[in-house]
Amino acid sequence: MPQTMKALVKAKSEVGIWMEDVPIPTIKPNEVLIKVHKTSICGTDMHIYKWDPWAQANVPVPMVTGHEYGGEVVEIGSTVRRVQVGQRVSGEGHVVGNVSRNARSGRWHLDPDTKGIGVNLPGAFAEYVRLPEFNVIPLPDDLPMDIAAILDPLGNAVHTALTFDLVGEDILITGAGPIGIMSAAVAAKAGARRIVITDINNWRLNFAKKIVPGIHTVDVTKESLKDAMKSVGIQEGFDVGFEMSGAEPAFEQMIDTMIMGGNIAMLGLPSKPFPLDVGKVVLKALTMRGIYGRQMYDTWYKMLAMIDSGLDLEDIITHRFESQQYQEAFDVMLGGECGKVILNWND
């Protein structure tokens, strides 16, 4: 094995990302080394690329970025027992400390001592990535590597969508990005009655129709959400909301159109704090729950089972590039008219 590898590095405290030669990671006894085959670009990667205030506050420079990937185990540490060389895998990107009350109670996704692959720890936009055995997700032999590369964001969608009962319920999704659209597909498979998704980007709304047959789309710059709700036969309000946008107007519209006693799962992160009309939440007896990442590891089991039973998300991938074409891939992401964008790290 060579001593160095190609990797996309946040090498400077400015806009951009750079392909560099860096040392291949050396694994610890409890870690595995994964040969990366495919990666996908995430919204977090775009924050790092644009070097916005969040990235400046959270990402040390230099840092190998990326955390959505599929690959193959090529080396295991001396204490690794469950994972084998040659196994096809993906990985949970949140590396936890395992000593907090939440972690020791099995709520690992709520461990306050959490570090992110590609954010605080060297990431997967590289030929190789190292990962604790605890975080490794073995994959079925017939799962395409392109799909393996989008399991991380699909997990966010599954965690959000399955927070509340969906069978026979009317669902409102605010934000038609890839995770919002994937959450719609999950809700449809889980038995939701009507699904309405909103955005201000018409391309995204049309894309949602392609991915999720029967979904109702609303461009809130042109159509009232309340009127759209009534036009599809929802009389009293939405039963369950998935807030995926982090946008204040979208959140306000969601609260206004929820049924009395409705449930809201919130994944979208606002770019800055905004006020909340708590009176409406109280008087409508709404239940709201914040969603962070994926439940470790129930979400992974559920999404792999849903894929095995027919959840088809192949078309959510709209662009594929070789790793050397990374700038083209990031430019596509910046353009805003795409689903998931894949980078191929195979020779």
For every predicted segment, state its role.
Residues 1-5, 252-256, 297-347:
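C-terminal hydrophobic helical "lid"/dimerization subdomain
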Residues 236-242:
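Short SAM/SAH-binding signature in class I
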Residues 95-174:
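NAD(P)H dinucleotide-binding glycine-rich loop of Rossmann-like/cofactor-binding domains
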Residues 224-235:
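Short amphipathic alpha-helix with an adjacent loop that forms part of the alpha/beta core around
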Residues 6, 170, 193-194, 263, ...:
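Residues at the starts of beta-strands that form the adenosine-phosphate
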Residues 210, 247-309, 345-347:
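Glycine-rich phosphate-binding loop and adjacent beta-alpha segment
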Residues 143-222:
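Mid-domain Rossmann-like dinucleotide-binding core that forms the NAD(H)/NADP(H) cofactor-binding site
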Residues 25-39, 53-101, 140-142:
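Glycine-rich beta-strand-centered segment in the early N-terminal region that forms part
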